[in-house]
UniProtKB/Swiss-Prot annotation:
Enzyme Commission identifier(s): 1.14.99.46
UniProt-listed NCBIfam families: RutA
InterPro entries: Luciferase-like_dom, Luciferase-like_sf, Pyrimidine_monooxygenase_RutA, SsuD_RutA_monooxygenase
UniProt gene name: rutA
Statement: the UniProt record of this protein carries the keyword Flavoprotein: yes
Binding positions for FMN per the UniProt entry: I65, K66, N131, E140, R156, Y157, S206
UniProt cross-references to HAMAP family, sorted A to Z: RutA (MF_01699)
Alphabetical keyword list: Flavoprotein, FMN, Monooxygenase, NADP, Oxidoreductase
Name recorded for this polypeptide: Pyrimidine monooxygenase RutA
Entry-linked CDD domains: Alkanesulfonate_monoxygenase
Annotated transmembrane regions: none
Record's catalysed reaction(s): uracil + FMNH2 + NADH + O2 = (Z)-3-ureidoacrylate + FMN + NAD(+) + H2O + H(+); thymine + FMNH2 + NADH + O2 = (Z)-2-methylureidoacrylate + FMN + NAD(+) + H2O + H(+)
Amino acid sequence: MQRHATVLLPAKERFVMKIGVFVPIGNNGWLISTHAPQYMPTFELNKAIVQKAEQQQFDFALSMIKLRGFGGKTEFWDHNLESFTLMAGLAAVTSRIQIYATAATLTLPPAIVARMASTIDSISGGRFGVNLVTGWQKPEYEQMGLWPGDEYFSRRYDYLTEYVHVLRDLWDTGQSDFKGDYFTMNDCRVSPRPQQPMKVICAGQSDAGMAFSAQHADYNFCFGKGVNTPAAFAPTAARMKAAADKAGRNVGSYVLFMVIADETDDAARAKWEHYKAGADEEALSWLTEQSQKDTRSGADTNVRQMADPTSAVNINMGTLVGSYASVARMLDEVAAVPGTEGVLLTFDDFLTGIDAFGEHIQPLMRCRDHLRVTQEVA
């Protein structure tokens, strides 16, 4: 009879990077192309994705929030689920993987988010955290009368600072009397409180966004850059580390990449070229138009990178295209960038992509050696 024992590598030998999946809460995932897989977002699809991710030893799953899409032939992101309710359902059908929902802070009062997060903390057994976004796409909020005016672009992190203050009050103590320019709490209560310290994540790439993350977030997401240039985001991670060091805190960077992999480099490259050839130009034009409406935040924002025509077919997230071995090597290069704690992955086809990652890519990654801790014992 055989059994398995867990063998941990000595700390000095560990080279660890966390892996997450950016679940497709909107139709067609992250490829704005008529040649890409076309599908609607459903709970069953996302359940299958996150359960596969858990089986393949992914560390976390995150969903965005999107309230209006880009249109075009593919109706890109015109069809979306809601983040908190989706992740509550996924928390109930998983057991180990960390679960993160996104709060569109212009639409939800912080006291309500605090209570919803505490509820999902209970459902998940302490596996839940919150991603906070300020909102950049004006039509998402104008359609429901919630856009506060274009001056919001320049003061959104002041708003978010007050927002997170209320959240921390309620999660940490169960009570808040916070008084600010945007929020007024009068003996506001939340109970039960989370059983674990609630993790807050943000996705700031502008100086203001990074300054906020340095002060208030536990992790900061950033875009990877380019195609098969895995370390090109290093200056962004360095800026985040410098901001966190200045604040006296440790805030690691988590980097967004799309993986397009196959058995050979040529096969993977052929898929990538096929997707680019089918780019939905109408939807991409709408994205470009929206990105130009924020004239107050500078050129270093996430949305400016998303709309760059260089690789807009997948909103210019870093893209790793190649054989399983090539992608594994590139992800190890990502892990070697100072300040990097993890990656958030999307796939051209999530169901087959996650299995291929777990079976063919992850076993080749040095930064995932800690998973190979089982050995047969006679």
